[in-house]
């Protein structure tokens, strides 16, 4: 087979990452846990001012979510369903700093990066696979580096398209890597609600 045909048949390797310790949509709890270690193991949410009784839950950790706290819920409602919840204010400067540091790591694997908010990105690592290995190998290396260098964990999805890569990052969390390949996606994805495709 000639090189041109090989290139045509090459499957793109997309990686979607999301910086997470607890369930994350906005790069918050990994960093807040680092700066509030005394709150580990307690129900937490990032939100507005609970004393003034205004604001909403921007994100909540797994402990709070198990108690019924949901993203977008008013703070007073979150307190009703989880009386022991602890609210911490958002720290955008901190989240942006972590986001920049993560992007610096990703830049060593590809220049084809598409940020999706401050805590998530699509990485097209197709051009890097001949040097650094397949998508799963690259994902494992990125996961290890983020954990070691930044002190937080990531959930990563690996697939040949962006939607399945994003779905993979949400499928298992926290600190997990999920691959949806052309061999396994029907067995897993077709059983999921269609709303899960872009959570």
Predicted regions and their residues:
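Gly/Gly-Pro- and Ser/Thr-rich, intrinsically disordered tail segments characteristic of DNA damage-repair
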Residues: 1-199
């Amino acid at each position: 087979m000639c090189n041109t045909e090989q290139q045509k048949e090459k499957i793109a390797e997309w990686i979607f990452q999301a910086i997470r310790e607890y369930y994350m949509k906005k790069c918050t709890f990994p960093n807040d846990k680092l700066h509030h270690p005394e709150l580990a193991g307690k129900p937490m949410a990032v939100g507005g001012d609970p004393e003034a009784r205004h604001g909403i839950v921007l994100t909540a950790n797994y402990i709070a979510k198990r108690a019924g706290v949901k993203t977008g819920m008013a703070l007073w409602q979150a307190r009703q369903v989880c009386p022991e919840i602890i609210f911490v204010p958002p720290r955008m400067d901190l989240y942006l700093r972590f986001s920049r540091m993560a992007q610096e790591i990703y830049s060593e694997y590809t220049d084809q990066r598409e940020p999706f908010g401050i805590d998530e990105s699509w990485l097209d690592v197709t051009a890097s696979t001949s040097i650094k290995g397949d998508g799963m190998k690259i994902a494992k290396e990125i996961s290890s580096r983020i954990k070691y260098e930044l002190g937080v964990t990531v959930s990563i999805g690996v697939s040949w398209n962006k939607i399945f890569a994003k779905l993979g990052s949400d499928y298992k969390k926290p600190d997990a890597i999920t691959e949806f390949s052309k061999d396994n996606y029907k067995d897993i994805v077709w059983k999921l609600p269609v709303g899960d495709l872009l959570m």
